[in-house]
Amino acid sequence: MAADLRTRLGHIELPNPILTASGCAGSGRELAQFFDVSKIGAIVTKSVMLAPRAGRPTPRMAETPSGMLNSIGLQGPGIDAFLQRDLPWLLSRGARAVVSIAGGTVEEYAELAGRLSDAAGVTAIEVNISCPNVEDRGQVFACDPGAAAAVTEAVRGRARYDIPVFAKLSPDVTDIVSIARSCVSAGADGLSMINTLLGMSIDPDTMRPALAGLTGGLSGPAIRPIAVRCIWQVREAFPDVPIIGMGGVRTGQDAVELILAGANMVSVGTTIFHDPSACVRILRELDEELTKRGVERLADVVGLAHEPRAAARRKRAGNVL
């Protein structure tokens, strides 16, 4: 018998916990030729900004031994085109849409939340706070508790009451729990983690940086242990806050690891580039991983690694992840 994979995105029930990660599949059109996008928990869109944005010069991507660096620069058509074209398409396919938003000022984030609140079909908002604050010398919102709280509060204040707001946290901080606390206190309904880590690669042949933008976001298997650590720390501090976990997930077993650390949902990103059907494959593998261990409900193993005595009892019974 298959496991019950239902989970909750704030107050909204999802049929399963597998989502796309923002930035790895546009708004889902690219994946529709490979699988039915309504079959996974939700499509998390590429971050949307108020105005169209060209992004950074090329080269924008560089492979690493265990992942990749990207320096896309939030290229996109802007909120008007998204609302006219992308969101209606997601609705027509029966997909649940978690819309990622990004901005350079607190007011830009708030305006985006207001625009989305007037639209039909927005399941939730993911707030990409890993953007430079143009009003504070380029300080990244996600790296300062006060700035992270200001953005979260502004978005929650402008978003429609029934749209959950998830703040997406950066691992490029010394204390991710303090950032999480600021966002939750400011009204976040949940948290997404982790965003990419800032990295750099130099081409030994050209003797120059591999990316035109010099630095980029590191993703892929290399960052999964960091994601597990961050999820663990935040779940330990906030037992009841919904968490979307992400970072280097390639298999159902990888997803299980994040779930045991405390993730209620798991976003799949970089692996989509070489396996466009990865989301449905990982969903199937997750079900298999749980079922073969006798786990009947996903909810029973969320954060289970925090309960060593309960886990020990399960192990003695021959039924443990």
Q: Which role does the model predict for each range below?
A:
Residues 32, 80-87, 149, 153-156, ...:
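Predominant activation on well-ordered alpha-helical scaffold segments within soluble catalytic domains
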Residues 104-244, 252-263, 268, 319:
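Alpha/beta enzyme core
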Residues 1-97, 102-104, 282:
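N-terminal capping/small domains of soluble enzymes
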Residues 1, 218-240, 250-321:
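Alpha/beta catalytic cores of nucleotide-metabolism and tRNA/nucleoside-modifying enzymes
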Residues 58-60, 140, 206-209, 281-284:
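Short low-complexity, flexible loop/linker segments enriched in glycine and/or proline
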